[in-house]
């Protein structure tokens, strides 16, 4: 039985060199080197991420090795989310709403490289929207990762559920870190734990504290 590709599979399958012009490749390499060289002594930087979610991803091994050579004192992630290569210090998955280790978008290729030499993390999970009128940048934000919550109580319950899932993965699957999307609302997304203006807590902080301090 032949299963046809999903309609969007062609978009995601261009993961290494495809759809990146030679001009853009050359510009990326120049900017990559300039950014690392100019900022590598900044104390607040703890990690370099070369590519995010296949966006313009090309020559992953070469570009990541360049960063490793330029700054041997920091952690380096080759690709945050999606197409992974066995290089760098961290294997990073993106998964919504629950944290998972593997592919969550049909048609997104991943390579199951061994993780015995690398840290395994979920770099993005959660994304539960809760829109508080009067506290947003746009009147009708459009960024939605999962079905919206409608109250502080509902967001607290759903956050608790998926955060406990992440804690279980730390015990059972060797997960070293999980990053919730996101701490605060941004311009076009209301999936934060506080509003864009930082004036309204959208979640019960006291109830989630024991979970996030796990």
Annotate the PLM regions.
Residues 208-214:
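Long, highly charged low-complexity segments enriched in Glu/Asp and Lys/Arg with interspersed Ser/Thr
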Residues 1-203, 207:
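Substrate-binding/catalytic cleft of secreted carbohydrate-active enzymes
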């Amino acid at each position: 039985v032949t299963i046809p590709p999903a309609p969007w599979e062609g978009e995601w399958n261009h993961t290494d060199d495809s759809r990146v012009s030679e001009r853009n490749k050359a510009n990326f390499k120049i900017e990559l080197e300039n950014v690392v060289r100019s900022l590598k002594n900044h104390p607040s930087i703890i990690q370099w991420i070369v590519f995010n979610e296949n966006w313009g991803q090309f020559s992953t091994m070469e570009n990541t090795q360049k960063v490793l050579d330029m700054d041997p004192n920091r952690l380096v992630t080759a690709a945050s989310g999606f197409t992974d290569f066995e290089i760098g210090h961290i294997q990073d998955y993106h998964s919504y709403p629950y944290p998972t280790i593997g592919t969550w978008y049909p048609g997104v290729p991943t390579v199951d490289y061994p993780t015995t030499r690398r840290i395994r993390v979920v770099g993005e999970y959660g994304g539960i929207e809760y829109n508080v009128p009067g506290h947003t940048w746009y009147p009708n934000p459009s960024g939605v990762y999962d079905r919206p919550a409608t109250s502080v109580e509902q967001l607290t319950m759903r956050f608790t559920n998926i955060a406990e899932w992440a804690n279980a993965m730390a015990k059972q699957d060797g997960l070293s870190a999980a990053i919730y999307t996101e701490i605060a609302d941004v311009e076009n997304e209301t999936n934060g734990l506080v509003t864009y203006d930082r004036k309204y807590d959208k979640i019960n902080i006291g109830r989630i504290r024991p979970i996030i301090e796990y």
